[in-house]
Amino acid sequence: MNQLSLKLSMSIIKIIIMATKKIQLDNFIESQNKLYSFTKEKLFTDVTIVLDDGNCQTTLDLHKAVLASKCTYFYNLFTKFSESKQSVIKINVANSYVTANIIASFYSQNTDTRNYPHWKYYLLEIMCLDFLGLEYDLEYFSKIQVPVEGFELLLDVVDIIGYTSDTIPIIARNLPHDYDFTKFPMELIEQLIKYVYSFDIILVNSNGIIDFFNIHGDKIKSISTFFTNNDIKYYTSHKINDELIVVFADNIVNVWNIKNSVVEASLEYPVNVKTRFEHFCYLPSNNHLISTSSYNIYVWDLSTNKLIKTVKKHKNTITGIHVSPVNDSQFVTIGRDDRICIWNAKTYNIVRCMISPVDCICYSSSGRELVIVNKHYIKVFNVSDGTFLFKMKINLNKSPNNIINSSYGKYIINYDAYIKIFYYPPNHLNDCTDIYCPSNYTQGIYTPDKKYLIMNRSDEDYYDVYDNSVAKDNKYVCNSFRIGKHVSRVFMFKDSSIGLFIVKNSLTSLYENLTSLMQLQTQEYFP
């Protein structure tokens, strides 16, 4: 009975204590609200603060004692500087509205942040709190995402916090695609390049849109070409370099500058060509663009935009064209006539022909071998003399779409819903490995750093990114990204890919240019 009475007494005491605390809190809030109301009524106020951010001014009648007790900045202002004798004090601040909210919090008032989106108010608040010498919370800063128009404000805040291993990745994550990176010092660029993806993915869609994505699947920008008419029978494209893409649509050929989003040139179109152009290669040394149509190859000089040569050597439709990775004075064509033709790119004469059933082909990394694939086997030929070097049976259930030379000795064949990996020269991993894929692919391309394999699906509006850097035992980590329109079909045709390209982003290009410039300057000073 005594224990029960004791418990009851303790419960009553707790209730009384809680009630007392609530009364005290209510009284405190009431007194703070009353004190704040005095600022509105100008009762007992002894200083007028004018907050000026350059765009707007906010005037507040306040109490020095409250300001000085809550903020060291105001304590010093009222005791150590000439403003201590002034009744009206003007203060230049980052934002008058946010600073006024901070001062209102000295009176225990809830702040109204509805005038700004959360990210903007948060950044402005850090700037204003820092100005007043008050602490700020950085928990949200680590995950902040700002729109393009907020990037400069983000940089202003990083200037306050400092450029550290914590803040530089935040800058990298929020970098606008077209930002003028020359504003950055070289030291910052050297740090940013560690965190920024190095390459952009370009997808040329069948609706006449050139879309840009980063490696994480985020769309960066789009360029709308004038080829948006459903009467167009075909639409295809080829990347010339990191700035130019040539776009074919019916009897029009335009060279687009993808940096400036403008048509840089129009190419002369061949007379009486009734079949579509399908396969392309670019020869940087003589600035020639080569394309195939039916049995013929066509050569444009991009210096003059003129068609300079038409050559017919194959006896059936040409199904592929590839330029040597080490010497663009040579390229190879394959056709349905099973002819594999090696060309001199200076004279446009055939140097050598080999006969072998072939669906797709690629050069080795050294440029000394040709690797050809059909649904039954893989063959390797010596480029210089055409001798047969290697053969391996594979027996695919469908003809392969393409073959990619991923790195020295490692090749990827794309067929049906699989990726097949094999090695040449043979080694202990020589047996082929099949990786099941979410869909059939029509195109595949590696980023120049060989870290990512981007595959373009044929039956869905996705592209897949395989992370080669974490691949173990030939198993890739795959991420799929929705891209909206089908990028692997052409109007009225099902079997042609339009365009899947990789370009360096502007930060990577700037870093390489600045690094080269610094090396040249070093050579000049220290020959």
UniProtKB/Swiss-Prot annotation:
Keyword Glycoprotein: no
CDD domains: BTB_POZ_ZBTB_KLHL-like (cd18186)
Domain BTB stretches: 45-115
Repeat found in the keyword field: yes
Protein origin, superkingdom: Viruses
Pfam families: BTB
Transmembrane parts of this sequence: none
Annotated keywords: Repeat, WD repeat
Record-linked Gene3D superfamilies: Potassium Channel Kv1.1, Chain A, YVTN repeat-like/Quinoprotein amine dehydrogenase
Start-end of each WD repeat: 215-266, 272-310, 313-353, 355-391, 436-476
PROSITE patterns with a match to the protein in the record: BTB, WD_REPEATS_2, WD_REPEATS_REGION
Family label: Belongs to the mimivirus BTB/WD family.
Name listed for the protein in its UniProt record: Putative BTB/POZ domain and WD-repeat protein R783
Taxon lineage: Viruses, Varidnaviria, Bamfordvirae, Nucleocytoviricota, Megaviricetes
